[in-house]
Design a protein with these regions (language model features):
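Short beta-strands and strand-loop turn motifs
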Residues: 101-107, 130, 181-187, 219, ...
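Residue-level signal for inorganic ion chemistry
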Residues: 10, 37, 55, 91, ...
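Active-site beta-alpha connecting loops in nucleotide-dependent enzymes
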Residues: 43-46, 315-317, 337-414, 440, ...
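A glycine-rich beta-strand to alpha-helix segment
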Residues: 107, 425-453
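Phosphate-binding loop of NTP-binding sites
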Residues: 87-220, 226-235, 427, 450-457
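N-terminal leader/targeting and accessory segments in enzymes
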Residues: 1-90, 94, 354-357, 384-387, ...
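Short acidic-hydrophobic, aromatic-tinged amphipathic segments that line or gate anion-handling sites
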Residues: 79-83, 412-421
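Acidic, Mg2+-coordinating active-site environments of NTP-dependent enzymes
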Residues: 69-74, 179-332, 357-358, 383-386, ...
């Protein structure tokens, strides 16, 4: 077994006494833990100390704890620290310090997980690449990603998210990337932050962690580009703007939107790189442009990265296309269930509008964390929904406003929550339908997706 962390490294990083063994990996979930890994008992919604005994029984080499949990013997292999989240952070910083990989950090109001996955996919064609799992982008997800960085990684891609002001900067400093990417500044988390200007300021904090002499990949077409570029230059970073405008360093051109694909040309450093993605939507092409620019900034061949993206598959819940069997044939499910904002919903509706279908159905849950602007933003998007869909189903108190703003012939059912729609929708589908499911994470729209997969027969 190859050790990711030796006993001595664990002790040096955390300041704890050396444990009796090293670890082949790092886990915070006893359900998915692999034998030989370090289990970190985080205090979250459920206290991880209650699962230490289970983790050790499943083969954990060590458990990081802040006390000896009940039911765990004094001789158990424990790494005792004052605070397990701080201990995980110490491992993350130590992993970053020892790694020789090229690090890229990605944030943004929309598209960050997709860009992260595009970078994972494209850079893997060049060399060993490590990246954040799922959307592990918060105060425990970032240090966990860093602590898991393989010793032989050539590239590492770290996603950084936020819910409140002041969360990005410390995670960016911990990551210390050579390349920092901001995908977009949009009305997401508008409630907690209060304005687009505050959102831009918070997203720009990723630049505070970037290493001097590094590169900032920024959305050229955003009205906040000049402000972000000035911050980057003040940090000693080179600026690469991506977008469709003539001033973009990485410029997306000749976009051809298909029902199931998008193709384009990416102009970068005098080269004209052909791009073809097996995922539709202009927003996907822009995400790919950001990923190609970031990979190039890390020293990867952008042509090879662009070519590799021809085999990219969208992340579950973020644009994945799933054929589902229905009476008389097949329908197409567009799974956008993971999260939602006005700009992301409009992009998804544009994909639905282009889908080859006899009937286009949009299933929309509330867009949360929009603050006082929330009601008006839901009403505004009703026009896009009416133009893109033949029938619109909604759930949640905010989408009731969207529902009421629709032309009567476009109104499907409105429900209080996604559980009701999950029971209602499957019997209504017909062969040839295309169904888009999208809503904020808190609306649990994945229940609708699962119901359509399981019961639409």
């Amino acid at each position: 077994m190859t050790l990711l962390w030796t006993p001595e490294e664990l002790a040096e990083a955390t300041g704890a006494a050396p444990p009796p063994a090293g670890a082949s990996g790092v886990s915070i979930d006893s359900r998915t833990l692999e034998p030989g890994e370090l289990f970190v008992a985080l205090r979250a919604a459920r206290d991880g100390h209650g699962f230490v005994a289970d983790a050790l029984a499943k083969g954990a080499a060590i458990a990081m704890v802040d006390h000896v949990p009940e039911g765990v013997g004094a001789g158990a292999p424990l790494l005792l620290v004052p605070d397990t989240l701080a201990g995980l952070g110490a491992l993350g910083r130590a992993a970053r310090a020892r790694s020789r990989a090229g690090f890229v950090a990605v944030t943004g109001s929309v598209g960050k997980t997709t860009v992260k996955e595009m970078l994972r996919h494209g850079l893997s064609a060049i060399g060993p690449t490590h990246a954040s799992a799922a959307s592990y982008n918060n105060q425990w997800g970032v240090p966990l990603t860093l602590a898991r960085t393989p010793r032989d990684a050539r590239f590492a891609v770290v996603e950084i998210g936020m819910n409140r002001r002041g969360e990005i900067a410390p995670l960016a400093r911990m990551t210390a990337p050579q390349v920092a990417v901001i995908t977009a500044v949009a009305a997401v988390h508008l409630g907690p932050l209060g304005s687009l200007e505050a959102i831009a300021e918070e997203k720009g904090d990723i630049l505070e962690g970037a290493l001097p002499g590094g590169v900032a990949v920024l959305p050229q077409d955003s009205p906040f580009f000049p402000r972000l570029a000035a911050r980057a230059e003040a940090r000693g970073l080179a600026v690469v703007g991506f977008g469709e405008g003539p001033g973009a360093t990485a410029r997306l051109r000749d976009v051809a939107l298909g029902a199931e694909t998008v193709s384009a040309i990416v102009e970068l450093s005098g080269a004209h790189l052909p791009l073809r993605l097996p995922a539709p939507g202009r927003h996907m092409a822009l995400n790919a442009t950001a990923a190609i620019a970031a990979a190039s900034a890390l020293g990867a061949d952008p042509g090879r990265v662009a070519a590799a993206l021809a085999f990219f598959r969208p992340v579950e819940g973020r644009g994945r296309r799933v054929p589902i069997r229905v009476p008389g044939g097949e329908a197409l499910l567009l799974d956008e269930s993971y999260n939602c904002s006005p700009v992301a919903l409009r992009a998804a509706l544009a994909v639905l509008a282009a889908a080859p279908a006899t009937r286009r159905i949009a299933v929309i849950g509330d867009m949360l964390e929009l603050g006082e602007a929330g009601p008006a933003l839901h009403v505004e998007v009703a026009r896009d929904a009416a133009l893109s869909a033949d029938l619109v189903f909604t759930c949640g108190p905010l989408t009731r406003l969207l529902h009421e703003a629709l032309p009567e012939e476009k109104r499907g059912a409105h429900a209080a929550d996604s559980e009701v729609l999950a029971a209602l929708l499957p019997p209504l589908l017909r062969a040839g339908d295309a169904v888009l499911v999208k809503g904020s994470l808190g609306m649990r729209m994945a229940r609708v997706v699962q119901a359509l997969k399981e019961t639409a027969r």
